[in-house]
């Protein structure tokens, strides 16, 4: 199965504002990628956000899916959800709080656009387009290391239908941007004989 969470974690590692450290021994403040069940549930981000000083991506691991209508053979569409989070810059001036809140939301929107550009670039690459000449080496490395399963999964992402929205302030100046994206599972819906007795 295509794992979008693995691809997004790799993006957080190479994206300069985040620079996620994926090591199991990383300090909480070195992390910028978190797996969560749902935002409303207690999770690692919520337990450590007061130690964080950089934007983060919180990927929801709950599974939402449906059968693709009119697909023959039958396929499954998955709904992927995640949150981008960033802390409002403190000005020390309560009168500037509204401007700081606006800037935090605009920063999140810029990060989302950067992430979409990354995903669109990879989708074009798996469809045979060459990477842009000014494409960062880290993005090239990811593109060149994609497995066949990753390539099919990226090709099935419905990037043109991506939706995102800003949410009210979470806590202590942390703002959220919720994201929804659908993807067509490249596997056909069929019986796998080895899974039966």
Regions found by a protein language model. Name each.
Residues 1-72, 130-147, 151, 197:
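Small/polar-rich, solvent-exposed N-terminal microdomains that initiate assembly or binding
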Residues 2-6, 71-77, 85-128:
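Extracellular/virion structural assembly segments
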């Amino acid at each position: 199965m295509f794992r979008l969470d693995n691809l997004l974690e790799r993006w957080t590692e190479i994206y300069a504002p985040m620079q996620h450290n994926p090591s199991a021994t990383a300090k909480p403040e070195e992390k910028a990628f978190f797996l969560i069940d749902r935002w409303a549930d207690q999770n690692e981000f919520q337990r450590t956000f007061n130690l964080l000083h950089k934007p983060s991506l919180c990927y929801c691991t709950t599974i939402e899916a449906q059968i693709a209508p009119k697909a023959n053979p039958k396929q499954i569409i998955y709904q992927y959800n995640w949150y981008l989070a960033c802390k409002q810059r403190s000005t020390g001036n309560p009168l500037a709080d509204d401007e700081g809140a606006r800037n935090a939301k605009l920063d999140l929107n810029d990060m989302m656009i950067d992430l979409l550009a990354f995903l669109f670039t990879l989708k074009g690459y798996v469809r045979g387009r060459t990477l842009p000449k000014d494409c960062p080496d880290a993005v090239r490395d990811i593109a060149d290391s994609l497995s066949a399963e990753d390539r099919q999964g990226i090709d099935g992402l419905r990037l043109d239908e991506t939706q995102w929205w800003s949410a009210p302030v979470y806590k202590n100046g942390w703002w959220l941007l919720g994201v929804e994206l659908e993807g067509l599972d490249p596997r056909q819906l069929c019986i796998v004989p080895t899974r039966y007795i």
